[in-house]
């Protein structure tokens, strides 16, 4: 399997001379974390929501050019799946542009696309605890949504577990939840303001979870069947960590020893 078999085609993009506010609107509307940036029709890099979220709407003359991450890797459609998967899981942007021989954008490859080839990558049968992240950014149901949204952007997270005082997981709130319900513009609201909203109003409950000693294949099946990207990990009914699609790909045998070169 090659990149051309699984990549997303006709991707959204922005030009280096377009305004940052326009790029941000596209990312909010489609719940994207990043967008390819073009210069004279060729890929110049990536712009991320994390980089531009704090550009105020009053600064309408700020262009994309000043925020381009030009050092991001690119792929071509003929690159094999193992190498492509390795590159995607080791990039901070989460999505990698796919270009033709003239450096023109022909697609995007994301972690979700990589999952289409998961059987070919030979996922190991190991406990979730071996690949989960143990230090988890969490929120509580009474937390102000503006602060939670800001944390998601700052740490580059697609969702946070919602826990009670006993560290029991009672729900999940995702960037998609925030965007779909129209709260993606509140990052500058005051927690004490009249328009403040709490997590409990939009969180999904009960949360989908896995146990620390479950096989990582159980988590992979959940991601595939439920189309979600992060799952809290429990040990003795308490939050012990979190596992995401990137962790799943890192646990594939085929990637062991693969390099980006």
Predicted regions located by residue number:
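Short, surface-exposed recognition loops or helix-turn segments adjacent to catalytic cores
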Residues: 100, 131-132, 140-142, 164-165
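Acidic/glycine-rich phosphate/pyrophosphate-binding loops and surrounding catalytic core
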Residues: 93
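A glycine-centered beta-loop-beta connector
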Residues: 27, 35-48, 88, 96-112, ...
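Tandem CBS (Bateman) regulatory domains
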Residues: 1-10, 48-74, 81, 85-89, ...
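Hydrophobic, helix-prone linear segments
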Residues: 1-47, 79-82
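Asp-centered catalytic/switch region of ABC-type ATPase nucleotide-binding domains
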Residues: 228
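Transmembrane alpha-helical segments that form core, pore/gating elements
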Residues: 141, 146-147, 156-164
């Amino acid at each position: 399997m090659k990149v051309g078999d699984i990549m997303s085609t006709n991707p959204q993009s922005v030009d280096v001379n377009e305004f940052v506010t326009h790029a941000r609107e596209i990312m909010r509307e489609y719940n994207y974390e990043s967008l390819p940036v073009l210069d004279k029709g060729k890929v110049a890099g990536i712009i991320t929501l994390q980089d531009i979220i704090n550009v105020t709407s009053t600064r309408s003359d700020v262009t994309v050019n000043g925020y381009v991450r030009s050092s991001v890797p690119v792929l071509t459609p003929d690159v094999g799946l193992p190498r492509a998967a390795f590159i995607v899981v080791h990039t901070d942007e989460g999505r990698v542009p796919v270009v033709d021989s003239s450096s023109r954008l022909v697609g995007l490859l994301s972690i979700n696309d990589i999952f289409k080839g998961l059987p070919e990558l030979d996922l190991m049968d190991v406990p979730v605890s071996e690949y989960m992240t143990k230090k988890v950014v969490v929120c509580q149901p009474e937390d102000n949504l503006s602060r939670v949204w800001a944390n998601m952007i700052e740490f580059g997270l697609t969702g946070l577990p919602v826990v009670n005082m006993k560290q029991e997981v009672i729900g999940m709130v995702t960037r998609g939840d925030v965007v779909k319900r129209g709260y993606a513009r509140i990052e500058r609201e005051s927690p004490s303001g009249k328009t403040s909203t709490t997590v409990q109003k939009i969180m999904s409950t009960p949360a989908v979870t896995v146990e620390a000693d479950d096989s990582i294949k159980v988590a992979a099946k959940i991601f595939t069947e439920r189309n979600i990207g992060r799952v809290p990990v429990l040990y003795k009914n308490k939050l012990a960590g979190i596992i995401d699609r990137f962790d799943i790909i890192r646990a594939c045998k085929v990637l062991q020893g693969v390099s980006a070169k």
